[in-house]
Curated annotation (Swiss-Prot):
One Pfam family this sequence matches: Ribosomal_S15
A GO term, aspect molecular function: structural constituent of ribosome
Entry protein name: Small ribosomal subunit protein uS15
Ribosomal protein in keyword set: yes
UniProt keyword annotations, A-Z: Ribonucleoprotein, Ribosomal protein, RNA-binding, rRNA-binding
Function noted in UniProt: One of the primary rRNA binding proteins, it binds directly to 16S rRNA where it helps nucleate assembly of the platform of the 30S subunit by binding and bridging several RNA helices of the 16S rRNA.
InterPro entries tied to this protein: Ribosomal_uS15, Ribosomal_uS15_bac-type, uS15_NS1_RNA-bd_sf
Xref: Gene3D superfamilies: 6.10.250.3130, S15/NS1, RNA-binding
Listed HAMAP family: Ribosomal_uS15_B (MF_01343_B)
PROSITE patterns: RIBOSOMAL_S15
Gene label: rpsO
Length: 89
């Protein structure tokens, strides 16, 4: 379920703040959201895969922590990001 190089590069290019930016909260949240969405499709076919479900829960928690950080740091960037990603927070 890992991202291939082209997918990751496209997501980074879409959400980066400056050229070469791969570590901003926006990029990290976008990558986590993409992985979470891919895993949700996996669970529709493999409902009993509890090992992967643990990884999914870990990703969701990491994304929530990053979103909480961004919300406290810059509310405008936070609102823009959740609007672009279609998250319901």
């Amino acid at each position: 379920m890992a991202l291939d190089v082209q997918e990751k590069a496209q997501i980074v290019a879409d959400y980066q703040q400056a050229v070469g930016d791969t570590g901003s909260p926006e990029v990290q949240v976008a990558l986590l959201t993409h992985n979470i969405n891919k895993l949700q499709g996996h669970f529709k076919a493999n409902g009993k895969d509890h090992h992967s479900r643990r990884g999914l829960i870990r990703m969701v928690n990491q994304r929530r922590k990053l979103l909480d950080y961004l919300k406290g740091k810059d509310l405008g960037r936070y609102q823009t990001l959740i609007g672009r990603l279609g998250l319901r927070r």
